[in-house]
C-alpha cells in the first residue's frame, strides 16, 4: 500500500495548484455526451466522497462488505460542477482526498484483506479497491491535463 499512497499524494500535490491555473474556457469546454474538465473534477469529488464512506464503513459493517454503486452522470449534473468556481472545486477535491490519504495511512493490514461484494457479485478486497481508486483518479487527472 505504501507505493499506492505515495503515488496518491504525488497526484494530489502536483495538481492542487495546477488545476486552478487552467483557463476557464478550457475547463468549461463541452463536447456532446462528454464531461467538461470541471465536470471530470466534479466526478472525482463524487468518487472521493463515496470511496471515503466505503473505506471507513468496511471497518464496522458486516463482512463481506456490500459495495453500493451510484449514478455518476446524475450526480455530476445535480451537483452543478460546471457552474462552480474552479478554486472552490479544487479545494473540495483536495480536502476530501487528503482525508482518504489519512484513512489509507492508518488502515490496519488485516483490513486490507476484507472482502467486498460488487453489484455484479464479483469479490474484491479493500486493498484492490484502494489501489483502483488511485488508478481511477490518475486516469481522470490525465484527462483534465490533456
PLM region descriptions:
Residues 1-6, 51-93:
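Short, helix-capping/interhelical loops that line the mouth of catalytic, cofactor-
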Residues 5, 9-12, 41, 45, ...:
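Generic structural concept
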Residues 7, 11, 17-21, 76-113:
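Acidic/histidine-rich alpha-helical segments that form the ligand environment
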Residues 20-23, 59, 108, 145:
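A structural signal for long alpha-helical coiled-coils and helix-turn connectors
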Residues 5, 9, 25-27, 31:
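An N-terminal domain-cap segment
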Residues 27-72, 101, 115-146:
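Short, contiguous alpha-helical
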Residues 1-11, 137-146:
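Short N-terminal signal/transit or membrane-insertion segments
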Amino acid at each position: 500500500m505504501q507505493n499506492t499512497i505515495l503515488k496518491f499524494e504525488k497526484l494530489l500535490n502536483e495538481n492542487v495548484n495546477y488545476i486552478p491555473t487552467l483557463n476557464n474556457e478550457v475547463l468549461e469546454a463541452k463536447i456532446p455526451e462528454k464531461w467538461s474538465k470541471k465536470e471530470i473534477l466534479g466526478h472525482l469529488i463524487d468518487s472521493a466522497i463515496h470511496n471515503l464512506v466505503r473505506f471507513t464503513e468496511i471497518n464496522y459493517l458486516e463482512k463481506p462488505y456490500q459495495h453500493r454503486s451510484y449514478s455518476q452522470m446524475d450526480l455530476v449534473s445535480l451537483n452543478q460542477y460546471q457552474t462552480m468556481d474552479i478554486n472552490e472545486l479544487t479545494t473540495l477535491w483536495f480536502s476530501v482526498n487528503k482525508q482518504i490519504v489519512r484513512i489509507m495511512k492508518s488502515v490496519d493490514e488485516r483490513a486490507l484483506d476484507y472482502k467486498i461484494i460488487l453489484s455484479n457479485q464479483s469479490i474484491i478486497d479493500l486493498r484492490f479497491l484502494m489501489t483502483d481508486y488511485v488508478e481511477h483518479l490518475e486516469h481522470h487527472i490525465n484527462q483534465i491535463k490533456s
